[in-house]
């Protein structure tokens, strides 16, 4: 596996597109690891400090993710180095998508990612640029559909991603307009935990959970885990956090999600980042959900959690461990050898799987069908891994082996 991984990591990407904005200091990259199956896809992220190497690592992660979620295409990623809170953000995105248009019309598909909203930014800005949908390039390059089928699938994608979730079991509030795009990745991260306990043995009820982040993925996964009977004991976010050894009620977690007006935690009894960072890792929890930025978790934080009862990590963030290696650095290995690590390309494949689902001919466009497709895909991937290795350790390594055999 290590040799396969080294080969995959060191292979140069097929296409690197570099952009410098003419009107601001923004710069960006699209990295396409390969045009496997004639196309590649991966979301667009924006933050201060994005680098080409970060985008390359995420493109490779996407390629592995598509072995689970489908379709069988290459991995790509877009990254823009710019402050997402800058009032010029929208104008920067408009110029970015105008520049990226030739790729998006032919063989590259994108979507929302960190600090870039799928429904309110990516879809409408692409449409203004005569890109029928952000995934048009995948339809052209991979699916090779005729005009009639392309239009039908664009319709399914256009209706499916912003579809409002009304089912009472799936939405935190049926009267608020939570879309599939808002909830589906976090749902998948929590379903990965539920399937893990049903496959490997154990019961979700009463398990304590630490959540890192409070954006869409973190918030939704906390909500669904609390709904299933798990107890959230702490949330840490870039701006601070909360901890409670006895845990928060399902009602309290729901209201934290409802109060959120941004991608950050907002509550009256917030601790500072320093205070929460000091206390949260040793509070004691069986489940850890890293769902903030990439490469945040340190060896010391991992050791503290393991010493205090950690059983399983479900990766809401891509590449959550603070290693410099793209895959399987020392912290990642240390986690995988000691606890159950459900890797990013399985746990957070929800949106990728939803896209793949919408690209099928005549798919059912209702919330239950979409969420079921995601849950079943994650279950199937974990069952494949369990079949090859039924131990509760080295789950990530085994899952990588299965994926890399398809790619190399």
Task: Give, region by region, the residue ranges found by the protein language model.
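N-terminal glycine-rich anion-binding loops that anchor highly charged ligand groups
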Residues: 23-36, 67-72
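Glycine/serine-rich phosphate-binding loop and adjoining beta1-alpha1 elements at the start
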Residues: 68, 72, 77-204
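Short, Gly/Pro- and small/polar-rich lid/capping loops
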Residues: 1-20
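Glycine-rich phosphate/diphosphate-binding loop of Rossmann-like nucleotide-binding domains
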Residues: 165-282
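Adenosine-phosphate binding glycine-rich loop
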Residues: 45, 306-408
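N-terminal cap/recognition module
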Residues: 32-64
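Conserved active-site and cofactor/substrate-binding residues in soluble primary-metabolism enzymes
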Residues: 50-54, 87-91, 95, 117, ...
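Rossmann-like adenosine-cofactor binding region
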Residues: 240-244, 248-341
């Amino acid at each position: 596996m290590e040799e396969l991984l080294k080969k995959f990591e060191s292979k140069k990407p097929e296409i690197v597109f570099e952009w410098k904005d003419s009107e601001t200091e923004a710069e960006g990259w699209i990295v396409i690891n390969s045009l496997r199956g004639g196309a590649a896809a991966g979301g667009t992220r924006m933050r201060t400090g994005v680098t080409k190497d970060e985008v390359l690592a995420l493109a490779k992660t996407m390629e592995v993710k598509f072995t689970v979620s489908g379709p069988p295409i290459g991995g790509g990623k877009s990254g823009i180095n710019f402050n997402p809170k800058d009032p010029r953000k929208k104008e920067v995105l408009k110029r970015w998508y105008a520049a990226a248009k030739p790729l998006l019309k032919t063989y590259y598909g994108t979507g929302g990612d960190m600090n870039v909203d799928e429904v309110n930014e990516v879809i409408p800005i692409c449409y203004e640029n005569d890109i029928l949908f952000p995934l048009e390039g995948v339809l052209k390059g991979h699916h090779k559909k005729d005009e009639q089928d392309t239009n039908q699938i664009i319709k399914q994608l256009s209706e499916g991603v912003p579809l409002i979730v009304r089912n009472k079991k799936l939405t935190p509030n049926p009267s608020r307009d939570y879309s599939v795009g808002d909830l589906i990745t976090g749902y998948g991260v929590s379903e990965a935990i539920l399937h893990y306990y049903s496959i490997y043995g154990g019961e979700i009820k009463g398990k304590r959970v630490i959540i890192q982040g409070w954006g869409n993925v973190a918030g939704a996964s906390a909500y669904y885990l609390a709904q299933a009977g798990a107890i959230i004991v702490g949330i840490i976010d870039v701006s601070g956090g909360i901890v409670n050894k006895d845990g928060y009620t399902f009602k309290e977690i729901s209201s934290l999600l409802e109060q959120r007006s941004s991608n950050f935690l907002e509550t009256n009894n917030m601790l500072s980042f320093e205070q929460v960072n000091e206390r949260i890792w040793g509070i004691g929890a069986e489940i850890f959900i890293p769902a903030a930025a990439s490469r945040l978790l340190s060896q010391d934080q991992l050791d503290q959690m393991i010493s205090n009862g950690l059983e399983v990590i479900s990766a809401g963030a891509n590449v959550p461990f603070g290693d410099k290696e793209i895959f399987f650095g020392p912290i990642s290995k240390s986690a995988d050898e000691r606890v159950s690590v459900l890797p990013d390309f399985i746990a957070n494949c929800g949106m990728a799987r939803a896209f793949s689902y919408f690209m099928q001919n005549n798919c059912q466009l209702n919330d239950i069908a979409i969420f079921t497709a995601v849950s079943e895909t994650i279950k199937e991937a974990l069952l494949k891994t369990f079949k090859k290795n039924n131990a509760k350790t080295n789950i990530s390594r085994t899952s990588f082996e299965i994926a890399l055999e398809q790619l190399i």
